[in-house]
Amino acid sequence: DVVLACDVLEHLRAPEDVLQRLSDCVAPMGRLVISVPNIAYAGVVAAMRHGIFDYSDKGQLDRTHVRFFTKRSLEKVLLECGWSPRMWEANRLPVECSELAWCWNALSGDLRQALLAGWQDFDVYQWMVVVTPSADTPAWEVAEARNTADKLRDDLQALSVVHQRERGSLLEHQK
């Protein structure tokens, strides 16, 4: 039993309501497949760096999008609505090939490098995730997954800070 919600949640004012209702549509041990645009895509970040957040007829900033998600924010909503992520897939698109390429190309090479430092998912245009109802998962597994995710996020943030400092020091010594 699989329910598809591909490119749906970003069009809803209250996707939480739909996610909670969908749990009634999925048979025990069933799955929900979700895809959403990634608002943390480097092209969007580059546009915002230029002070631009203009809606368009298609793409990341489609004018019909009323909710925006990063991987982390989608994961949080899913967990809060009783869904457990089982498998993530990243739909990667080089920024230079996107509708936001001009914003990216207008940034200096140094600024692009600074933005990308320690950011492995900069080119994720869309996140896809397979989830199952949390009721099908032992409570300890959900808690363990949350703790592991929180620890990994904290570790990544700490490593990023150290990397930035070391990079800055290296650049300073190269002068």
Question: Model-predicted segments: where are they?
Answer:
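S-adenosyl-L-methionine-dependent methyltransferase catalytic module, highlighting the catalytic core
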Residues: V2, R13-D154
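Conserved Walker B
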Residues: V8-L12
